[in-house]
Amino acid sequence: MDTPKMGDLYQRIANQINEMIPSEWENVYLYAEILDDSSEVYFYFNIPGKNEFLYSHNIPEHFNVSEDIYDDLLIELQESFEELREEYEKNNPETWTNLTLKLDRTGQFSIDYNYEDVIASELNGSQRKAVWVYKNLGLMPKRKTVRDFLEDYIKTNEGKI
């Protein structure tokens, strides 16, 4: 169940994402993993007229943005997701561990919450990321070891991805 505070947090998160991207953009696909003792947030976005998706952590290099400014904005975004998780816990019997947020430039968004115990998962962080990127963007990893893993994973989990 969403609460008014969650609605405010969704708006704040959308604004923070917009502030982090130093250009016009079409779509954002964001992954947030918030656990009791750690958090990770990253996203991919595309620029109008281009099909290529850019990785959020490459913004400083790609757009010549200060790494310190980017890191500060990323920490603020992570804190917003931590606050969202706390608010969610107050109003729902089950706590999510990660989510996928899809946002377009008109402000339309969707959030898919996932309750999987990522600590107990057989996949490590880079493998989870590879699966998520493939599921949401259809992109294969560049690094051979991760690409080989994903190809095997796709074969093994055919129809589940």
Curated annotation (Swiss-Prot):
Coiled coil: none annotated. GO terms for cellular component: cytoplasm. The keyword Cytoplasm applies. Keywords: Cytoplasm. The keyword Cytoplasm applies. It comes from the Bacteria. Pfam families: YezG-like. It is found in: Cytoplasm. Its main location: cytoplasm. Immunity component of an LXG toxin-immunity module. These modules promote kin selection, mediate competition in biofilms, and drive spatial segregation of different strains, indicating that LXG toxins may help avoid warfare between strains in biofilms. Neutralizes the toxic abilities of cognate toxin YeeF upon expression in E.coli and in vitro. Monomer. Interacts with the C-terminus of cognate toxin YeeF, probably with 2:2 stoichiometry. The second YezG molecules binds with lower affinity. This is Immunity protein YezG. It comes from Bacillus spizizenii (strain ATCC 23059 / NRRL B-14472 / W23) (Bacillus subtilis subsp. spizizenii).
